[in-house]
Regions:
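Short loop/turn elements at sensory-signaling interfaces that couple input to output
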Residues: 141-156, 164-170
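PAS/GAF/H-NOX family sensory domains and closely associated sensor/linker modules
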Residues: 85-109
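PAS-family sensory domain signal
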Residues: 28-85, 179-187
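The N-cap/first-turn positions of alpha helices
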Residues: 202-206, 216
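Per-ARNT-Sim (PAS) sensory domains and their PAS-associated C-terminal
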Residues: 113-143
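PAS/PAS-like sensory domains
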Residues: 46-50, 103-124
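Regulatory hinge/linker segments at domain boundaries
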Residues: 179-202
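Recognition helix of helix-turn-helix DNA-binding domains
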Residues: 213-248
Length: 259
C-alpha cells in the first residue's frame, strides 16, 4: 500500500537515492543515443504525448519533446532539466504518491539481474499543471531504455499521455508490468484479490475488439456470448481501472500493453 511517510521525507529519500547512484558511461554512449533522438521526436508527434529522458549519470533530463496540443501541454519543457522542477508542476496531493512509486521502482530494478532490468514498464497516473496553470490528468509510462557499460540502468524514459483536461479528484493507481510475461509485479497488493493480472483473458478479448471499433452487439456475436455479458465486462474494466469512460479505460489498457 501507499506509504504514510511525509512528502518531505519521501523527497529526501528519493533525491538521496538519485544523488548516490553511480553508473559508467562514455562519449560513445551519448553518441549512440543522440543518433536515435529523431525516433523519439517522431513518436511524440505521432502519438500526441510528451517524452522525457532522464540521465542517471548526469542527474538531469537530457531530452524532452511534447506532441501534446498547446492548450494542455505541461508546464514542463526543455528549459527544465532537473527533477525538482518536474515535481514542482505536480498537484500537491499527488506528489507523495509519485515519489513513493518512483522509490519503490528504483529499489526493485536495482535489485534485479542486469539482463532483466529493461523488461519492465511502470504505468501510473497523476495531475500536472498545463501551460495555463490548470491541472490536467496524465498517465506516465516509465522504463529503462539504456544501460551503462556494466549493465546498470542509465537512461530512463518517461512518456506522458493526457488522460483528461479535468482536474477533478482521481483514484491514484500504479502498475508494474513485465513486458515479456505480461505479469504484474511490486504493487500486486493494490490489485483486487492480490491478482497478478489486472484483467481476465475474456476482458482483454472484449477490450481488444472495442479498440477495433466494434460495438457490444458485434462483440457478442464474435465471441459467442450475450450482449449483457459484454456490457458486464465493460463495467468490470471501468471499475478496475477507476476510469470514467471506455475511452479512458482503452488508454490504460493500451499503455499497459494489453491491447
Amino acid at each position: 500500500m501507499f506509504t504514510l511517510i511525509s512528502t518531505s521525507d519521501l523527497q529526501q529519500l528519493y533525491f538521496d537515492r538519485i544523488s548516490k547512484y553511480s553508473c559508467t558511461v562514455t562519449d560513445d554512449n551519448y553518441a549512440v543515443f543522440e543518433k536515435n533522438e529523431h525516433m523519439l521526436i517522431l513518436m511524440s508527434e505521432i502519438e500526441n504525448n510528451s517524452i522525457a529522458v532522464f540521465d542517471l549519470y548526469k542527474k538531469e533530463f537530457i531530452f524532452f519533446r511534447s506532441g501534446i496540443k498547446h492548450k494542455t501541454r505541461t508546464g514542463y519543457d526543455n528549459d527544465n532539466k532537473h527533477l525538482h522542477q518536474f515535481y514542482a508542476q505536480l498537484h500537491p496531493e499527488d506528489i507523495g504518491f509519485v515519489l513513493d512509486t518512483k522509490i519503490k521502482l528504483f529499489d526493485f530494478l536495482t535489485g534485479l539481474p542486469p539482463t532483466e532490468r529493461n523488461n519492465y514498464n511502470l504505468v501510473f497516473n497523476f495531475r500536472m499543471k498545463n501551460k495555463e496553470g490548470a491541472y490536467c490528468q496524465y498517465i506516465q509510462r516509465q522504463m529503462v531504455i539504456e544501460s551503462d557499460n556494466e549493465g546498470k540502468p542509465w537512461l530512463v524514459m518517461n512518456i506522458n499521455n493526457l488522460l483528461s483536461e479535468q482536474s477533478t479528484k482521481l483514484t491514484l493507481q500504479r502498475h508494474l508490468v513485465n513486458l515479456k510475461t505480461g505479469k504484474f509485479h511490486l504493487f500486486n497488493n493494490e490489485l483486487e484479490d492480490g491478482a497478478t493480472q489486472l484483467f481476465t483473458e475474456r476482458e482483454k478479448e472484449v477490450f481488444a475488439l472495442i479498440a477495433q471499433g466494434l460495438d457490444s452487439t458485434a462483440i457478442a456475436e464474435k465471441l459467442f456470448i450475450s450482449e449483457h455479458t459484454v456490457n458486464n465486462h465493460r463495467r468490470h474494466v471501468l471499475s478496475k481501472t477507476h476510469t470514467a469512460n471506455t475511452i479512458q479505460a482503452l488508454v490504460y489498457a493500451k499503455l499497459l500493453g494489453i491491447i
